[in-house]
Amino acid sequence: MARASSSAAAAFLCALATLVAAASGARLAVRAGGTGLTVRAGGGASATAVFALGSFWRSEAAFGCLHGVLRTSVGYAGGSKPNPEYRNLADHAECVKVEYDPRQIQYKQLLDVFWASHDPREVFGQGPDVGNQYRSVIFTNGTLEARLAALMKEREQVKDRSSVITTKIQPLGAFYPAEPEHQKFELKRKPFLVQLIGNLPEEELLSSTLAAKLNAYAAELCPPKTQKRISSKIDEIAKKGWPILRDI
């Protein structure tokens, strides 16, 4: 029995490793036809991933400090209502869209953050946020992402079979950007940080890699060493009379 269990685990890990390699190394070939791959102005390729994991205010911050993440934004997906709004989501979920460089970070690493940043076993919400709009969903772009998401969902399930993982895995349909006041929410709660990067207009704030990182920093979701490094950089800038922060 132990030998069979060991063989099953080995097979699972082998399948997972194969899919990780395919989803990263083969991404350009597989996804060039459509849904998740774009070409940046500098010639490099970027990919997008969309997740629902509770309130999108904090969810956006969970991904902003990752090396290789280019920008983040929040919105609505997974429902049938055209043009949903925050006060009228209907059957949509609050979600975060992550644009990243697949040469620097793998889709699997984004999934790891997804699982670690919420409780996928909760039903009808997350923590104090109750409602269908806070459900757990992995929105996939293509077969490779769907298969990898399913394998990692099973990995999470086998950790504890006393309760069921509620996360749904479904193809990404339309993504509707949320209203400006919901973008970079954690960052906007710290006006001095917004001022520190030059009070960027909403469009630039939405597309800024620096703003995505500071949004994570404001929520204290960067790794401890990174949090400390950014704090030191901000202190240094403040001592110089608050010039504009260009990078962290």
Region roles according to the model:
Residues 2-248:
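Flexible coil/turn and secondary-structure edge motifs
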